[in-house]
């Protein structure tokens, strides 16, 4: 397996301001980082390719939603009760530790046995009781050698209060997905009630890590790019699966680890449906196009005790780095769990219409609100009441309706300061469509992790030990640098023209005016991963020619200054190959 010089890479990242610890002048904050110009530029380019590869290619509906969510939303989604890690305390110093990390590290230091190997495989999924038993069994101590407390659950969400009086409990969102589920009804209407369709969202998510570590891999604030593909349970074939079915990938599944095509994975039932297989294939193509080493990429199927009870299947795209195999993308078939939870929690009907092959007769509740009475009482608020009543789900009505006599039923609804009693009755009718809650297949991308893995995979040392990042031109923080051997005023206008042409075409261009040798200028740009360097030299004054140097081969060509910008643009866009 390839080795990475983690220390040297992280040294360069800090020296060249790819990344720095947040508030470093005050000593920094664990688990929070700021991106400098090159780091942010690479992240922007990753997201640009992600949008092109997924959102534009698949006609996804991209939305932006708030980073703060009310308690009720996250209670319904299960995050208030279940978004937890297990922690333990040093009984002497009071230091706290994430239990699975502490136990895992301790077991790895012990003499390997079959039993310890089995414990390591399930440490991520252990309950508090199982953690306590392992700590006792192997006499695991804190990093200071002290006895550990009993383990306990720790909710990972950041909570706050909003408003002058702090009356409403809010949380920083633990994932971008919830905003998409909350807007499902509007997204469905926007898409003319047609299924399947996919929405997408890019933004910050937050996780109050017990013990952040591994740089960008485990942080308290991170960027996510998430897709929610809404599809009917029995219609998970994908019309474009044939475009990825021949891709061979390393799949670690329940039975074995093997390299097979996605077509074979579907036929053998290893991957549960074509839509899931399609997103696995598209994810692999995206990561490889970014510059991730194909040999250091695998897809691992979640173990049954690792997967949520409602999930029908879950795969992680894992990338090998100096920290080992790290999960960078999760692709899960979440069934109809999320929308069902929010329908129950909000009391709003989140079903969509599905045309039936044959009409059928159904019974449903019909509400009869006294519009005259409540219109007079509520005036401007009456339209809001009507929207609330019309949005009530059949499931909610069925659960809360009360019989008040023979063939008479009543539903009580709280609205503002009123309790409104609404008569309701069961009505039979013939329908040509049915209301269903779709399933969701969710590819979730951890952008910070992908960024770090890409940085490691792009790093190498030349024979003279000079460091280089071999970022692809479309991903590099700066696509082209311009410099000179000796400065002459005659260069200025041409440098400006080249820079303007390239920046007008969406490229990032850096003019290197350092007073140092051209070799040092090249090395400085190699450390940033800049693929092309245009050099003006004294001969330009005679022949109007400049030199283009390519980063990885270090080869140079001389071209006419007027043709130079378009030649560089072709190389960067991949329309011409350097040879």
From Swiss-Prot:
Keywords: Aminoacyl-tRNA synthetase, ATP-binding, Ligase, Nucleotide-binding, Protein biosynthesis, Transferase
GO cellular component term, pick one: mitochondrion
InterPro entries: aa-tRNA-synt_IIb, aa-tRNA-synth_II, aa-tRNA-synth_II/BPL/LPL, Anticodon-bd, Anticodon-bd_dom_sf, Gly-tRNA_synthase/POLG2, GlyRS-like_core, tRNA-synt_gly
Reaction(s) catalysed by this chain's protein: tRNA(Gly) + glycine + ATP = glycyl-tRNA(Gly) + AMP + diphosphate; 2 ATP + H(+) = P(1),P(4)-bis(5'-adenosyl) tetraphosphate + diphosphate
Keyword Nucleotidyltransferase found: no
Domain of life according to the entry: Eukaryota
EC number: 6.1.1.14, 2.7.7.-
Binding site for glycine: 175, 226, 442-444
Binding site for ATP: 207-209, 218-219, 327-328, 449
SUPFAM superfamilies for the chain: Class II aaRS ABD-related, Class II aaRS and biotin synthetases
UniProt-listed CDD domains: GlyRS-like_core, GlyRS_anticodon
BP terms from Gene Ontology: mitochondrial glycyl-tRNA aminoacylation
GO molecular function, one term: ATP:ATP adenylyltransferase activity
Gene3D superfamilies: 3.30.40.230, Anticodon-binding domain (3.40.50.800), Bira Bifunctional Protein, Domain 2 (3.30.930.10)
Similarity comment: family membership: Belongs to the class-II aminoacyl-tRNA synthetase family.
Oligomeric form and interacting partners: Homodimer.
Record's function text: Catalyzes the ATP-dependent ligation of glycine to the 3'-end of its cognate tRNA, via the formation of an aminoacyl-adenylate intermediate (Gly-AMP). Also produces diadenosine tetraphosphate (Ap4A), a universal pleiotropic signaling molecule needed for cell regulation pathways, by direct condensation of 2 ATPs. Thereby, may play a special role in Ap4A homeostasis.
Protein's UniProt name: Glycine--tRNA ligase
Origin species: Encephalitozoon cuniculi (strain GB-M1)
């Amino acid at each position: 397996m390839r080795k990475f010089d983690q220390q040297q890479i992280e040294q360069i990242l800090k020296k060249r301001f790819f990344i720095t610890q947040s508030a470093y002048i005050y000593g920094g904050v664990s688990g929070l980082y700021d991106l400098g110009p090159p780091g942010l530029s690479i992240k922007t380019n990753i997201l640009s390719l992600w949008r092109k590869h997924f959102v534009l290619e698949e006609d996804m509906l991209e939305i932006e939603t708030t980073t703060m969510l009310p308690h009720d939303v996250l209670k319904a989604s299960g995050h208030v009760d279940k978004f937890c890690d297990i922690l333990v305390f040093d009984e002497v110093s009071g230091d706290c530790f994430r239990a699975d990390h502490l136990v895992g590290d301790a077991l790895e230091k012990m003499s390997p046995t079959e039993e310890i190997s089995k414990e390591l495989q399930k440490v991520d999924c252990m309950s508090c009781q199982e953690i306590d038993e392992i700590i006792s069994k192997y006499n695991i101590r804190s990093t200071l050698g002290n006895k550990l407390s009993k383990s306990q659950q720790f909710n990972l969400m950041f909570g706050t209060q909003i408003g002058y009086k702090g009356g409403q409990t809010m949380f920083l969102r633990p994932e971008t997905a919830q905003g998409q589920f909350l807007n499902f009804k509007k997204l469905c209407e926007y898409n003319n009630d047609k299924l399947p369709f996919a929405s997408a969202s890019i933004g910050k998510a937050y996780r109050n890590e017990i013990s952040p570590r591994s740089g960008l891999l485990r942080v308290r604030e991170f960027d996510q790019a998430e897709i929610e593909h809404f599809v009917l349970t029995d219609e998970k074939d994908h019309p474009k699966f044939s475009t990825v079915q021949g891709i061979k990938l390393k799949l670690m599944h329940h039975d074995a680890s093997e390299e097979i095509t996605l077509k074979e994975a579907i036929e053998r039932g290893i991957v549960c449906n074509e839509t899931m297989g399609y997103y696995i294939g598209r994810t692999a193509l995206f990561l490889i196009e970014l510059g991730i080493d194909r040999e250091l990429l695998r897809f691992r199927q979640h173990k049954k005790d690792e997967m949520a009870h409602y999930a029908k299947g879950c795969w992680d795209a894992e990338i090998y780095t100096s920290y080992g195999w790290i999960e960078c993308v999760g692709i899960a078939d979440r069934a109809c769990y999320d929308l069902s939870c929010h329908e129950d929690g909000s009391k709003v009907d989140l079903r969509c219409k599905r045309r039936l092959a044959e009409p059928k007769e159904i019974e449903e509740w019909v509400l009869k609100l006294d519009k005259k009475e409540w219109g007079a009482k509520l005036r401007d608020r009456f339209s809001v009441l009507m929207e609330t009543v019309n949005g009530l789900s059949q499931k909610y009505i069925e659960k809360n309706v009360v019989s008040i006599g023979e063939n008479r039923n009543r539903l009580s609804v709280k609205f503002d300061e009123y309790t409104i009693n609404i008569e309701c009755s069961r009505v039979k009718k013939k329908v040509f469509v049915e209301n269903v809650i779709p399933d969701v297949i969710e590819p979730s991308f951890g952008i910070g992790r992908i960024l770090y893995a890409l940085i490691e995979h792009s790093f190498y040392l030349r024979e003279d030990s000079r460091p280089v990042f071999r970022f692809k031109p479309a991903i590099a923080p700066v696509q082209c640098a311009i410099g000179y051997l000796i400065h002459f005023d005659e260069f200025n206008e041409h440098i400006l023209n080249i820079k303007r042409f390239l920046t007008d075409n969406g490229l990032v261009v850096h003019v290197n005016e350092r007073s140092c040798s051209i070799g040092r200028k090249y090395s400085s740009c190699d450390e940033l991963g800049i693929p092309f360097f245009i050099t003006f030299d004294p001969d330009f004054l005679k022949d109007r020619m400049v030199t283009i140097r390519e980063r990885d081969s270090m080869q140079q060509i001389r071209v006419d200054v007027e043709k130079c910008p378009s030649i560089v643009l072709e190389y960067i866009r991949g329309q011409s190959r350097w040879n």
